């Protein structure tokens, strides 16, 4: 049953809902508990917290004649809001709502929807969402249905979203369905999305939740959700309960691929690295391709994550793999280098080249120079992977003047090599690297050479070229 089929016991304009919304907005937990436990009847009452149906209470007073093709109504609106008959409409997800042109909408105008959008809930869902354990116990004791979900999500879903383990356990003890699907096709395990929800996931599994259940339009398993969110402890729990480490979602991704593709804040990188190491130890395929033929290494390089790239390369990832678009991992990191300065993208380039990645076709080097000009360390590492590269003075034109001045010593040393053979030391480096091939990273540190010379062989950037 969709939420449009429910008749709320407490509609949006009722006095109780107004007081409840006021308490929720003010974060007055005591008042919320009091309203839920003492004033709302019956125990499974349907409460309407929002109603955006424009036909009932439109934010823009659109005349009904417009829907009927009434030209007399259409012309004034066209004259007032847009003159271009081919106006582009801004659509948010699957809905269109009327918007007047304004700087906030960047000049785009939206339209309207006939969809009946409401936010319906129950006292139990509200209590579970806010972690009011005593209130949940009280409502269940009065016979509240633990699986009621008039708004599309049940109390278990709400408790898991909030990471309220005690509420989850109470609901499960009262026979809540641990695999209840929301209107979006998500089970409670799919909503264990934060570190605080680990106890919720544990309780769900103890009560028979399926660790392999796919959900939502993405057809993700709980392990995919944990991987996308960088939740290493959740992943450990799911794997211990029999989750398939290389299960595919609707985009053809494994959990490892999903983990490598998710954007991370700097403080999340360590946790993501632990998660990926765990998946690889449990047998995850390091080179698994998704529907676009992208490997986990492609995705790690797309974020210039050198520590993650090195981890994958140590587990056998192919440094020269090509996706459907013909892009290699090296190509991916070069595309993102100028936007990921804090990630030290030269480290990722260095790791790929030391594990056998083909370098860039010489004729394409000016394009790389243009793209990565603001990251001279990337240019240095890549340039040193060629025994000899014919430079042209015309290449200076692709470097913005302010960038050239900011990194003047490096670019002066680069163009000083135009029409000049590289030094013997560099040519010896290239000969050794060609001999070791994709094992440079493993074999060069074994050579009886001083550390600075080993670093030189491994293309460690020095700031200038010789």
Curated annotation (Swiss-Prot):
- Pathway the protein acts in: Protein modification; protein ubiquitination
Q: What does this protein do?
A: May be a substrate-recognition component of a SCF-like ECS (Elongin-Cullin-SOCS-box protein) E3 ubiquitin-protein ligase complex which mediates the ubiquitination and subsequent proteasomal degradation of target proteins.
Domain comment from the record reads as follows: The SOCS box domain mediates the interaction with the Elongin BC complex, an adapter module in different E3 ubiquitin-protein ligase complexes.
Under the heading Gene3D superfamilies, the entry gives: Ankyrin repeat-containing domain, SOCS box
Q: What is this protein called?
A: Ankyrin repeat and SOCS box protein 18
Q: Which domain of life is it from?
A: Eukaryota
For this protein, the record's SUPFAM superfamilies field holds:
Ankyrin repeat (SSF48403), SOCS box-like (SSF158235)
- Similarity annotation: Belongs to the ankyrin SOCS box (ASB) family.
What gene, per UniProt, encodes this protein? ASB18
Single Gene Ontology BP annotation:
intracellular signal transduction
Q: Which organism is it from?
A: Homo sapiens (Human)
The protein's matches in SMART domains, at most eight in alphabetical order, are given as: ANK (SM00248), SOCS_box (SM00969)
